[in-house]
Amino acid sequence: YRLRWFDRWLKGIDNGVDGDKPVRLFTMGGGTSRKDRNGKLDHGGSWHDIDDWPLPGTQYTPYHVHADGSLGVTQPEPSQPTCYTYDPRDPVPTMGGGVSAANDIMPPGGFDQRGDTRFYGCHDTLPVAARSDVLVFQTTELQEPVEVTGPITVRLWAASSAIDTDFTAKLIDVHPANADYPDGFSQNISDSIIRARYRNSRDTPQMLTPGQITQFDIVLYPTSNLFGVGHRIRLDISSSNFPRFDINPNTGGALGQDRRVQLAEQAVHHDPEHPTHVVLPIIPTDRQ
C-alpha cells in the first residue's frame, strides 16, 4: 500500500491509489487464543479499508466500574470508594504497549499482564492484577463479540492524599483459559496516564486539594480490537507504569528535581454522583 502511494506521488505512476479509501486499519482479534507455531498468542486480526475516521455509526458506550470489581453498562449504585496506596518506590512495571524506543527494557506490543524477567522492574511472575495498587474492573464473559474501534477515554473520579500524583488506565482483553494458557491470557490493548497537576491544562499546573474528589479524563491511544465470545473486557486503574512513564513522587515538587518521595492514598469513586467509566467506541458486528 505504501509503495503504491509513493509510486503514484513521487514517480507519477498512475496506479489508481488516489481512488483508494482514505483510511486503512487493522482490527485485532478473532484468533484461536492458543499458541501459534512460534509459541505466541494467536490473537488474529484483519485489515479494513474505510471512508472516514472515527468509523461512521460508532456507538460511544460508557462502561461503568462498580464496587464489586465489575465493569458494565449499568449505572453504579451508591457505594464507598475503592482505595489503594501508591508507593513511588515500587511502581507498576511496564508490560508491553505502544512503545517505540528502549526495547531492551520495554518490549513493545501485547503481552500477558504478569511478571516476566523481560520487563524492567519485575521481581516475580505474579499477575499484575495481584498487586494491591492495581484496581481491576472487568465484564462477565462476553456472550457475543464486541468490536472496539476508535478513540477511548476514561473518566475517572478520584481523590488523593497528595497535592500531585498520577493515575493510569489500561484496557485489557482477557482471553479464556485453555490448554496452552491454563490461567488465560490478559492482553494489554491500550493505555495512558494523567498527571494530576496538568489535568486541566499543560500550561497552567493546578495542584490537588488532598481528599477532594476530582474529575480526571485519561485519553487512551485509539485502537481496534475484537473482544471475542468468552473473553472479558477489563480496565485496570493504578498510578504508575514505569519505565514507560516517569514516576511521580507525589510531592508536588519541580519535575525531575525532587529527591524525596511520599506515599499517596488514592480513592477511586464509583457512585451515581461520581460514575467512573470508560467510553468504548463500539462498532456494530455487521461491519464488513
Range-by-range predicted roles:
Residues 1-288:
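C-terminal, loop-rich substrate-recognition/catalytic regions characterized by aromatic stacking residues
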